[in-house]
Design a protein with these regions (language model features):
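Long, highly charged, low-complexity intrinsically disordered interaction regions
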Residues: 116-177
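DNA-contacting surface of Y-family translesion DNA polymerases
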Residues: 178, 186-286
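Short acidic, glycine/serine/threonine-rich loops at helix termini
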Residues: 14-16, 39-42, 146-154, 192, ...
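A short alpha->loop->secondary-structure connector
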Residues: 115, 153-160, 195-198, 216-219
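Residues that scaffold, gate, or flank divalent-cation-dependent active/transport sites
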Residues: 1-100, 104, 111, 224
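Short Gly/Ser/Thr- and Asp/Glu-enriched loop/turn motifs at secondary-structure junctions
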Residues: 98-102, 141-144, 236, 277-281
Length: 290
């Protein structure tokens, strides 16, 4: 079984933990709204006003004038992330970090020591809460794809288990947009086909999916059937240092893109300094989901 652990509003939650007077208030971590900054993280209070990550800070302030803006302390968040990762490694060496605030864990070999996967997931969630005073949402499922969806369903402070014999019952009522690789354009095609749920997608003939999406159609069919054979890949000796983010909405203005490029560059630079390294080559990778 696979666990996906995802820290809830990580940057903002760390700030609220360290400054109890911020509890219950709308918190935004990111750039100065007077200097073309961008929202790096928003707590759940401010999200109720429509604020989300990757949004220009000036726009966020218009949506929630009472929001409290805090500068990002990326080095410190990395230290807290290391503490979280140490908790993961108590239960399994098979930990695949995705970013500072989320990771996949393969706990298939941990049952004799720590009990069933659901128990391991709850122990991890409890340890993070008790030792670090932070909240994680946890999904437990037969594979990475399902575990990721499970951890997202009941945020914040969620815990969802998907049993192997209940995969289709879990997936079928969900909207097709829950599938990896279904972006705005793909969603429009499904709407024209009358497909709204994963169940409806699963019932489409594979030939129809391939005719509209090519080889991507077969990938979507497998996900709709709950199939994901990717293993959890633990940390290896790094040959490169990178940082990436996924935007909740498309970015199409140069100022926001420039601000985020600077943000990601600063995060990579901090990690280089932590490990006393320097880079020789710089690469920029852009991915679009259609």
């Amino acid at each position: 079984m696979i666990i996906h652990a995802d820290m809830d509003a990580f940057y903002a939650s760390v700030e609220q933990r360290d400054r109890p007077e911020l509890q219950g208030k709308p918190i935004i971590v990111g750039g100065n709204p007077d200097q073309r900054g961008v929202v790096a993280a928003a707590n759940y209070v401010v999200r109720q006003f429509g604020v989300h990550s990757a949004m220009p800070s000036a726009t966020a302030r218009k949506l929630c004038p009472q929001a409290i803006f805090l500068p990002a302390r990326l080095d410190y968040y990395a230290q807290v992330s290391d503490q979280i990762r140490e908790i993961f490694h108590r239960f399994t060496p098979l930990v695949e970090p995705l970013s500072l605030d989320e990771a996949f864990l393969d706990v298939s070999g941990s049952e004799r020591l720590f009990g069933p996967a659901e128990s391991v997931g709850r122990q991890i969630k409890d340890a993070i809460g008790q030792e670090l005073n932070l909240i994680a949402s946890v999904g437990v499922a037969p594979n990475k794809f399902l575990a990721k969806i499970a951890s997202d369903l009941e945020k914040p402070d969620g815990f969802v288990r998907v049993d192997p014999d209940a995969v289709q019952a879990f997936l079928d009522p969900l909207p097709v947009e829950r599938l990896w690789g279904v972006g705005r354009q793909t969603s429009k095609v499904f709407q024209k086909l009358g497909v709204r749920t994963i169940c409806q997608l699963r019932e489409l003939p594979l030939s129809v999916l391939k005719s509209h999406f090519g080889s991507h159609g077969e990938h979507l069919s497998k996900l709709a059937h709950g199939i994901d054979n990717r293993p959890v890949v633990p940390d290896r000796e790094a040959k490169s240092i990178s940082h990436e983010t996924t935007f909740a909405t498309d970015l199409d203005d140069q100022e926001s893109l420039r601000a985020w490029l600077l943000e990601l560059t600063e995060q990579v630079a901090r990690r280089l300094r932590r490990h006393a390294l320097r880079g020789r080559t710089v690469e920029i990778d852009r991915k679009s989901v259609v």
